[in-house]
């Protein structure tokens, strides 16, 4: 490629609405331009990187035995009504009517469509296993699209769907996809972690997320630096922090705590560690034809409720936060001084694992300006229902017993799910088993955010000059910057020869023949993030030298003209082989 025949749309300034580095640099590097909120044009520079991501994804999906197809972006409402997600999905599902007033959606995902394919095309267990995948444009009507391609409304995604005759088959399909994802993100040159995760709105029984590690990541990841353990904070198991409950050492006592409604303030007033206080979270669940059930969830004062874990407790699937009126009616006092002692009405108490092992702790007295100290299980309170209902914290013991937890931020770029029969049962996608009986197929689904990968890669690879692409997804691997290409025959001949040699070796190279000043050329290609740069000039040629600089290098080095091509070829191939 020659730059004079290519579109390079670099900008000196980022748009005012760009909040994070990747959004700013993708616009400035001429990769994207905004069309509407969360919707972008992908300019030639950006599209080249997208195609490289797609190529790696396709190679690894094919290697894992998946079969590519293409499903429609527009889907009939009937399929979503069959699965039950027409009502459940919410406003992120873009719905519209055609001229016949029939309901349709723009697909945010394709479980329903692919299940429809399977139920119509797969009749026998002998046709299984099968794994279909596509690379398709999706649309989710985000309430607040932001961060460029990181949280857009329209985006490109690879989604795959496996069908098996039984759970053993599903587990094997899942393993193959998990391994394929590890290979994909390794080849993309990203620092990533695979973490145990919650299934969310997709449903199913087991899942892992793949996160690119970056300070700007929206997700908190709990991991153990001395083992392989990693999980989304929402899913990470929180072990009890007290091995055994100590015997009571204090008498229970009602204590004045005027104006101290927060655990931190109570601990400071009483001159005790925050870890001895109890935080009371009040939830409510509806009962048809009866009053709501009120729940009191007890956490240590320095811990936070994990709502996903709480929602999985029996009876709490559809909980909501209790209203102030419900709290006053049940406890006799407004929030701030609540606890399990002397409630006006019965409540269901659930204690976090750590709280269940505490002794001589402090709870609200259900009276404004008062707390009760020296409270103990068994003596002052009945033994509680015990569950893991909190988020893990840095320094907690790792669930695998091999160290302690640390927390980092991550950007989710992939997710694999074991769906089971959630969709096949709802949509009657069955096949005949070995006995001739119809059986719902076991499904898995596996997604990768193709366009999101670009933003995540930039968040992990940039400096004050611009993007620093991994070779595997750089729009170009090498840029040739001739000084005076249009004025010096020697420079032009050397540049053209080097260009031809690199092309013949299969290197993705661009020759900047625009006639720009050196400062403009260098600034453009550093902003765009091309990994390798060779500068050809009359002065260097007289000495038989070219100037080489890797995008991560602090300084340039001189290479003999006759060695320059092979040196760069070796560097590119070594990087791609990692």
From Swiss-Prot:
The keyword Nucleotide-binding applies. Disulfide bonds: none annotated. SUPFAM superfamilies: Class II aaRS ABD-related (SSF52954), Class II aaRS and biotin synthetases (SSF55681), YbaK/ProRS associated domain (SSF55826). It is found in: Cytoplasm. One of its GO terms (biological process) is prolyl-tRNA aminoacylation. Its main location: cytoplasm. Keywords: Aminoacyl-tRNA synthetase, ATP-binding, Cytoplasm, Ligase, Nucleotide-binding, Protein biosynthesis. The keyword ATP-binding applies. It comes from the Bacteria. GO terms for molecular function: aminoacyl-tRNA deacylase activity; ATP binding; proline-tRNA ligase activity. Gene3D superfamilies: Anticodon-binding domain, Bira Bifunctional Protein, Domain 2, YbaK/aminoacyl-tRNA synthetase-associated domain. Its EC number is 6.1.1.15. It catalyses: tRNA(Pro) + L-proline + ATP = L-prolyl-tRNA(Pro) + AMP + diphosphate. InterPro entries: aa-tRNA-synt_IIb, aa-tRNA-synth_II, aa-tRNA-synth_II/BPL/LPL, Anticodon-bd, Anticodon-bd_dom_sf, Pro-tRNA-ligase_IIa, Pro-tRNA-synth_IIa_bac-type, Pro-tRNA-Synthase_IIa_type1. GO terms for cellular component: cytosol. It holds the Pfam family tRNA-synt_2b. Homodimer. Catalyzes the attachment of proline to tRNA(Pro) in a two-step reaction: proline is first activated by ATP to form Pro-AMP and then transferred to the acceptor end of tRNA(Pro). As ProRS can inadvertently accommodate and process non-cognate amino acids such as alanine and cysteine, to avoid such errors it has two additional distinct editing activities against alanine. One activity is designated as 'pretransfer' editing and involves the tRNA(Pro)-independent hydrolysis of activated Ala-AMP. Consists of three domains: the N-terminal catalytic domain, the editing domain and the C-terminal anticodon-binding domain. Belongs to the class-II aminoacyl-tRNA synthetase family. ProS type 1 subfamily. HAMAP family: Pro_tRNA_synth_type1 (MF_01569). This is Proline--tRNA ligase. The lineage of its organism: Bacteria, Pseudomonadati, Pseudomonadota, Betaproteobacteria, Burkholderiales.
